[in-house]
Amino acid sequence: MKKYSAAVMMIDGFEESETVQIIDLLRRAGVEAHSFRFQEEPFVVGMQNLKVKADKVFSEEVKNYDVIVVPGGRTCAAKFIANEEFMNTLKWFNENNKLIAGMCSGTTVLEAAGVLAGKKATGYTGYEAKLISAEFVHDVAVYDANVVTSQGPATPYPFAFKIMEALGIDGSEIEKRLLCREAGARW
């Protein structure tokens, strides 16, 4: 079985639940998930002031990963969009039909990069007006073409399972072990 890899982006102001939980779930599925930061300082500070040590500094190495993940956070989208090298990397992933995943405000970053054009996507409440090039779907997680999107801080589980699905990974055993259905999962 192929070993997949995921590059999860982290920038100051990231939404902790959307970032840490995704890394955890993907690693449980056997995905080599690494967090990437945009500064030399190894610790990135989340929205709730949680300091998380990122694995690596953002570089061209990200292009070697099977999927790039853009979590949300109120102040993150503008920072990601302002980073030309990062935006070019998203465009490169899209042009090369590699998997791109974004949730919450991260979906607006995908929109700004032109990744969502003509694809079904979802995002945070009220983002239908922001994701204008996409066909907006009111669902917790959506997979279309080479893009996975999700709504917000309470949806990392369905988001991670959609990423697994897109990679061809059966997440049902993980779902069972984590008691997702017993906890009321509806994805």
State where each predicted segment sits.
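Active-site-adjacent pocket-lining segments in enzyme domains
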Residues: 3-10, 14, 25-37, 55-56, ...
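Short N-terminal binding/cap micro-motifs at the start of the first secondary-structure element
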Residues: 14-18, 43
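Short amphipathic alpha-helix
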Residues: 21-22
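N-terminal beta-loop-helix "entrance" segment that forms/cooperates
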Residues: 36-55
